[in-house]
């Protein structure tokens, strides 16, 4: 089974989590492709998306992921054959905590993509080891693939 991992990061935290999940999935025998800020044309044939994103500014997607989701929102393509999950990183100090993860989820569902498990929202204020925290969530993602 092939999994496309997309990361959007401003300070690198989401990128580190995405790379860690990529390594864990490969160790478990999955085929993966890891993209840091892809274009839609890079991933339009991928059927399983794991999106790992931080929240930037006033609840925005990071600059390296925003163009993809703008393009996706404006696309006429049917994404009903795409299954996805989202991992969001943010700070609960802000009222826009993990808004980028919410935007990713809403955009994909508006395009008929199928969410396969609950979104993981990591509060960077309370979780020191975000990579391990995300790894603990990974079995629910894998279960959703079945």
Swiss-Prot record:
Keywords: Electron transport, Flavoprotein, FMN, Transport. InterPro entries: Flavdoxin-like, Flavodoxin/NO_synth, Flavoprotein-like_sf. This is Protein MioC homolog. It comes from Haemophilus influenzae (strain ATCC 51907 / DSM 11121 / KW20 / Rd). GO terms for molecular function: FMN binding. The gene is mioC. Probable electron transporter required for biotin synthase activity. The keyword Hydrolase does not apply. Residues 3-142 form the Flavodoxin-like domain. Belongs to the flavodoxin family. MioC subfamily. Its cofactor is FMN.
